[in-house]
């Protein structure tokens, strides 16, 4: 059994979602201001943190730094959706001014340059060598003990809606 508890209180009434401000310094400030630690649940613990998505990684970077600063032994990350590979062209939800702001694309570029974008499907798949390299690079950059993403098929299955009725553009670039 893995106990479930919230190792910090996330105070959000006066702060927007951290990925929404267009300025990186403002995103960092918002991310940091929202967290209040519960030391008994952090100090000396191995933590598993689940987030809805990883867009730029702003909130996760701040959260992981915060957890280590408060004594966490390990911090493992799980994303409830696949790696975000494309900016939303329909709702502008991710608010990225460039697709290179998206963490997954940034890491792919660092690993292989423009050539890597030919292999986005492989990078999204944790069972491939490229998929594992991307995850390892993210762990190194963010000091995660591990990181995993939900697969697109797993996400669609969990939603229970026919695939043709779900927009998956930000994950696979398919309209």
Regions found by a protein language model. Give the residues of each.
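PRPP-associated nucleotide enzymes
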Residues: 1-175
């Amino acid at each position: 059994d893995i106990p479930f508890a919230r190792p910090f209180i996330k105070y959000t009434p006066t702060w927007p979602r951290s990925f929404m401000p267009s300025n990186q310094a403002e995103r960092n400030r918002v991310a940091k201001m929202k967290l209040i630690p519960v030391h008994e649940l952090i100090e000396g613990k191995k933590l598993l943190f689940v987030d809805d998505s990883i867009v730029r990684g702003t909130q996760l970077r701040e959260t992981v730094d915060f957890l280590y600063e408060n004594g966490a032994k390990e911090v493992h990350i799980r994303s409830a959706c696949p790696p975000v590979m494309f900016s939303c062209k329909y709702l502008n939800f991710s608010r990225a001014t460039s697709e290179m702001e998206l963490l997954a694309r940034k890491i792919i570029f660092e690993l292989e340059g423009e050539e890597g974008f030919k292999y986005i499907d492989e990078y999204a798949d944790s069972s491939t060598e490229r998929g594992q390299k991307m995850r390892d690079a993210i762990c190194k950059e963010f000091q995660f003990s591990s990181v995993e993403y939900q697969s697109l098929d797993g996400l669609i299955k969990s939603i229970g809606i026919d695939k043709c009725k779900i927009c998956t553009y930000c994950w696979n670039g398919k309209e």
